[in-house]
């Protein structure tokens, strides 16, 4: 019977066989163990599970939000057009199942409706903030469940906000600054200059510089492209200088030479959507979908959601430090809070018992006093009744005596009458 031998790890000396921090030794293996296939397992699992990406589009009505999304994914996702006659800002939410090769993407697009159409625009950002917080709250409640299933949970948190800026060519509107200021701590903001084909190339660059200057001066934090990852560093370095992206959307195909391209046909020529000399659409698409989608999701979870979670748990009485300012785990916090809640329940239960017993004693005293009053009243009435009975008995005896005397007198009267009648008869007989 063949024996199965295990390949033993051997230490590779480096710099005099030094050890790393925490006594972690760098080792290599001889032979095949199989854990080199872990990346393949993750890829297979991710493909099987599919991916989720949630986009929030904020901009005035008719600025081209739906058209740009259709252009990004090269399909018609939305047919109906929004009206300009909304009394309040609303949100339209649509979820789509997209597939490219063997990769499935569940895409959720949230678009503002009626944004910027009101006379009083001061609170236009509030429905957007409320929606983002509601998605954070839903995820937090799922996390706090005893039997939670985040693997199967549909993550509806907003991963990126495409903020559409009107191509005025001058500066940002007060509404833009107010909204982005209230959103920058909750979502990854990517500013876009919509309908960039309405501005000349020189004016467009001036407008970009003006926008970035206003964002910085107002302390508005937009999404910072990561440059610390090797795969994305070079691409992001070349793109970061283009912010805000000047974009044009179109799903129509026009003929340029002998080929059909997506673009817009004007009397003066053709604007090609995917021509980098005409607009920044290709740069935006590559940055958003090809390079940084996972980073946007990771930053949403580790920064924006964690900030919301921390503030929410603080309001609930949870902290991430102990009495001596030492960091503690969430499990320790939960157990301490659970014990505190249990002790509080015990105290409140004891207080309720004491209050109940006190009220019982008070009621018993009230009942005893009422019982005594009733007993005294009963005795008084009983005494009155007995006195009445005594008087009636005396009256009865008196009446009975009077009746006896009456019958005696009656009998005597009857005897006298009988005697008189007899004497009268004798006198008559004697006369005869």
From Swiss-Prot:
MF-aspect GO terms: GTP binding; GTPase activity; molecular adaptor activity
Record key words, sorted: Cell cycle, Cell division, Cell projection, Coiled coil, Cytoplasm, Cytoplasmic vesicle, Cytoskeleton, GTP-binding, Nucleotide-binding
Oligomer status and interactors: Septins polymerize into heterooligomeric protein complexes that form filaments, and can associate with cellular membranes, actin filaments and microtubules. GTPase activity is required for filament formation. Interacts with ACTN4. Interacts with SEPTIN9. Interacts (via C-terminus) with SEPTIN4.
Protein name (record): Septin-14
Domain Septin-type G: 49-315
GO terms under cellular component: acrosomal vesicle; axon; cell division site; cytoplasm; cytoskeleton; dendrite; microtubule cytoskeleton; perikaryon
Keyword hit for Cell cycle: yes
Main location: cytoplasm
Tissue specificity field: Testis-specific (at protein level).
Binding site for GTP: 59-66, 114, 195-203, 249, 264
Disulfide bonds: none
Lineage of producing organism: Eukaryota, Metazoa, Chordata, Craniata, Vertebrata
Presence of keyword Cell membrane: no
Gene Ontology BP annotations: cytoskeleton-dependent cytokinesis; neuron migration; protein localization; protein localization to perinuclear region of cytoplasm; spermatid development
Residue ranges, annotated region (Required for interaction with SEPTIN4. Required for migration of cortical neurons during corticogenesis): 369-432
CDD domains in the record: CDC_Septin
Family under the similarity heading: Belongs to the TRAFAC class TrmE-Era-EngA-EngB-Septin-like GTPase superfamily. Septin GTPase family.
Coiled coil regions in record: 332-412
Record region (G4 motif): 194-197
Pfam families found in the cross-reference section: Septin (PF00735)
PANTHER family documented for this protein: SEPTIN
